[in-house]
Amino acid sequence: PYVQFVHDSMRNNMPWNEFAHQLLSAKGSGWSEGNGAVGYFVRDKGMPLDNLSNTMRIFTGERMECAQCHDAPFNKWERIQFYELAAFTNGQQEINRGPWNTVWREVRDAKEERSEFGRLVEWLGDNVHYFTLGGGGKGRIKLPSDYQYRDGDPGEMIGGKTHFGKRIRSSDRRDDESARSDFANWMVASNDNFTSVIVNRMWQRIMG
């Protein structure tokens, strides 16, 4: 469904800002008609910080990979800023886990986890049943246990914050279920980077 969504979007000439917004804000079942965009986050299941790095590079041209672990030595990004952005998409999970959990429990009780049947059940869970996305982002996140700078403490809860374009923030005291939607709105409507990146890429493709 995710690949089909991408193909259909290109075939129907969906505007770039609408396409990006759907990728960043979609939720629910990826098997629902027209909802394949949830695959953007499901594809990186278990790797939300890597997803944030990719998102910033794809849609804004900002290279934040280094700032995931330390202040970047060759650009402006600091580790605290990386986590402030990651807060907007933090806290997503699969929905409707119950039915598959019941099946997997039976497989486990029968000690069939490593059998061909067990591997098939696991694959179906990961690639079919769990092609879903719940949660609108918490809008807050804990700094990692190895956080090493004076602007935060290991394990400290921080709220979301953008650092260019329109400034948006979220609280570090309570979850904000609109955080991911707010992040998507900011991405496509509130910063010049989003526009310049796609223009530069199209120019390079045309002009070589």
What are these regions (language model features)?
Residues 171-173:
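Flexible, polar/acidic helix-loop-strand segments at domain edges
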Residues 188-193:
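Conserved pre-motif C helix in the palm subdomain of viral-like polymerases
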Residues 164-168, 186:
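Individual transmembrane alpha-helix segments
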Residues 176:
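Glycine- and hydrophobic-rich flexible loops that cap the catalytic core of alpha/beta enzyme folds
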Residues 1-151, 155-158, 162, 181-183, ...:
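Short, structured secondary-structure elements
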